[in-house]
Each structure stands twice: as structure tokens, then as C-alpha cells.
Amino acid sequence: MFKTLYARIAIYSITVILFSALISFVLTNVYYHYNLKASNDAKIMKTLKEARQYEQSAKPTHIQQYFKHLGQMNYQIMTIDHKGHKTFYGEPFREDTLSQNAINNVLNNKDYHGIKDKPFALFVTGFFDNVTDNTVGINFKTNDGSIAVFMRPDIGETFSEFRTFLAVLLILLLFISISLVIASTYSIIRPVKKLKLATERLIDGDFETPIKQTRKDEIGTLQYHFNKMRESLGQVDQMRQHFVQNVSHEIKTPLTHIHHLLSELQQTSDKTLRQQYINDIYTITTQLSGLTTELLLLSELDNHQHLLFDDKIQVDQLIKDIIRHEQFAADEKSLIILADLESIDFLGNQRLLHQALSNLLINAIKYTDVGGAIDIALQHSHNNIIFTISNDGSPISPQAEARLFERFYKVSKHDNSNGLGLAITKSIIELHHGTIQFTQSNAYVTTFTITLPNHSH
């Protein structure tokens, strides 16, 4: 029964209503006991004493008729003579609980204040307690001697119509309150159920069907953020599918090539061709190994929570090491590398930053024309570190420029790279809270600019 949010809210609300009614009854009873009981006692005592004055001025034979008249006026009366004989007028009492000591005191001319002195009972309202000790009493003088007269208003008779009205009112109040609780609970739960169904659609892979934002409260905010999450998950799913397709293509193509080369290797006995096939297979497997390494690095960057960025890096020395490592490739194309480096320290991940800067230099060497030049600069600028690397080469179209940092994107179909280098570089720079930009001048000079926050101090 409590497994659904609808049942929980409805039952909790109904419980609150009933508990509030109970507490209200108890507090009302407390209020009567401490604020109204004494004044109620005094009013009834005043009425009884006025009745005694009237009877003392009237004929004594009329006293019984007078008590009957008071009984007809919605009072309950009990009289006791000195012999202990009791006579009741009006509606009967529910129970005779009056003590003999109280009777004797009244017969001895001591007034009795049973209403005021009624002990407090938590769940019994003294005002409605129809027993003989919940009365006021005084002594009446008659021809036959003193009698003790005890009286209280007949609440049941006095408020009979009001009691019916009150009962109907309470029943309607509870019915309407519970109905409204159930209806309001349903109005709250309904969009939550729709969210549940939408979540189930997400689990099944449906990222296209939105949910309508029907409210402006917290649930409406939840609906809005759910749609945003759905769109993000849809984009992630598309990226995942695209990534799988690209990886499959990047692996399938060289594997197909290797399979073809192995077939040719089996069929030929020419030593020169065989050596050429072996060299080609070695080159392709090297590319596959590089692809695997970069895919693992991408996975590491996507799940970067374990990475530390607290290495103290001497950036200028790091760049010099990268240049020295790639100098052979530059010399093969007769390239000149010009470096203007300020001495700068930086806190980050040295392994990753080395990879990012190496990718940029390798790209520059690869796309710079033979005999060209590569310019590298490192400098402070306010609170930032600025690294630029420029080279002249073939122009890049605006369409290609917009997709330059996408995974597996290649500017040329004849490019033998796997299209991951710049994507890896961008991820590394962003993990260091930096930015990377690409610009191209009219003279076909391409420049990559990296901006890093200088928080080394």
C-alpha cells in the first residue's frame, strides 16, 4: 500500500487531518478547563440562586412544579432531602456519581461547585459530561426541611439541533478535505508518473520524445531539466554511435589492408615484393598501435576524476624537450623551428601537457611545406600563459576549420592520421582550465593559440 508515492502522500495528508482534529479537540478541552469552566460554574450557580430567591418569595407548595418547569427549560435537576430520598427533573443523568460528602455539605448550607472542581480529563470535555457530580448545588428551605438541589444545563437537549448540524459539518469537512487531498495528491503525482514513463523510454533508448512542461513549480523545473537531460543524453548517444562507427572504420580499414597484404605475401615469391609487403604491414600495425594508444588516452581524459594536476612544470624546458625530440622529423623536411620562450612555471599534469604540445608540433611539421618555418612563442600576459605555434602551409576551408577539433575528423581523405590528435589536445587544455584557438591569415599562415591560467604561485 505504501509502495507508491500517491498512497504515501494521500495517507500522510489524511493522517495529518485526523491528528490535527484530535489535537484541536484536546486543546479545546484544555481551554475549557482553564478558561471557561469557572465562569460556566458561576453562571449556573447564579441561575440556581435566583431560582431559590424566587421560590422563597413564592408559595412553598409550588417548588416541585417549579423544578419541573426548570426541567422543561433544558435543565437537569436532582433534589435530595434529609432522608436521602432523590428526585430527578428534566432529562435523566447518564450516571449518578455524586458523593455523599458533597450532599451532606449542601444540606449543611455549603454551596457545591462540581462544575468548577471537575477534574481535568484529556479526552472528556467537562462541559458535556452528563453526570451528577458535574453540577452546582445549594440548600433550599421547604416546609419539610432543607433539601439539597443540584443542577446543570441539559447540553444534549439544548444543543440537539446544533449537535446534528455540527456532526454533519464535521462529516462534510472530513469528506471534502480527504477528497481534496486525494485530488491534489493525484495532481502532484500525475506529472511524476509521466516523468517515470519518460524515464522508462530513456532506458529503452528513446531520446526523441519530450515531456510537456505543464507547471511552473519544482515539478515544472524538474520537467525542464529532464528535457535538457534527454537532449544531452541524445547527443551523447549520437556521439557514442558516431565514435563506434569511426573506431570501427579506423580499425577495419587497416585490418582489411593487412589481410590483403598477407594474401599477396602468401602468393608471391618475389623477395622484393615480400619485403615491401612486410614493411607495409609493419607500418599499418604501427598506426593501429598508435590508434589504440590514443583511444586509451581519450578514455582516460573522459574519465579524468583520478588525474592529478599538481606537477610543477617548467614549460619552456618542456617545449625545448619536445622540439629536440621532433628535430629529426623537421630536418627531414628542411624545416626551421624558431622558438621565443620565456621562463615560466606552471602547475598541471606534465605527462598530458607534453602530449598536447607534442601533437601541435607534430601537426605543424606534417603540414608545413618543405623548407618552411615553424614559429613557437611562450610568454606571460596578465594572469595567463600564452603559447602559440605558427606555420605556413596549405589553406584550410571554413568548413574544415569549424570541425578541426572533432574526434576522427580529417581535413583530407588522403590523410593517414587517425584524426584524434587535436581532439586530445583540446581535451587536455580544457582539463587545465585553458582554451585553444585556431586562426589563419591571408598568407596561409596557420596559428594555434593556447591560453592557460597562471596559478603556479
Curated annotation (Swiss-Prot):
Autophosphorylated. InterPro entries: Bact_Sensor_His_Kinase, HAMP_dom, HATPase_C_sf, His_kinase_dom, HisK_dim/P_dom, HisK_dim/P_sf, Sig_transdc_His_kin-like_C. Keywords: ATP-binding, Cell membrane, Kinase, Membrane, Nucleotide-binding, Phosphoprotein, Transferase, Transmembrane, Transmembrane helix, Two-component regulatory system, Virulence. Its EC number is 2.7.13.3. PANTHER family: HISTIDINE KINASE, SENSOR HISTIDINE KINASE CPXA. Gene3D superfamilies: 1.10.287.130, 6.10.340.10, Histidine kinase-like ATPase, C-terminal domain. It comes from the Bacteria. The keyword Nucleotide-binding applies. It is found in: Cell membrane. It is a multi-pass membrane protein. It is an enzyme of class 2 (transferase). The chain crosses the membrane at residues 9-29, 164-184. Residues 186-238 form the HAMP domain. It catalyses: ATP + protein L-histidine = ADP + protein N-phospho-L-histidine. The gene is hssS. This is Heme sensor protein HssS. Member of the two-component regulatory system HssS/HssR involved in intracellular heme homeostasis and tempering of staphylococcal virulence. HssS functions as a heme sensor histidine kinase which is autophosphorylated at a histidine residue and transfers its phosphate group to an aspartate residue of HssR. HssR/HssS activates the expression of hrtAB, an efflux pump, in response to extracellular heme, hemin, hemoglobin or blood. The keyword Methyltransferase does not apply. Residues 246-456 form the Histidine kinase domain. It comes from Staphylococcus aureus (strain MRSA252). GO terms for molecular function: ATP binding; phosphorelay sensor kinase activity.
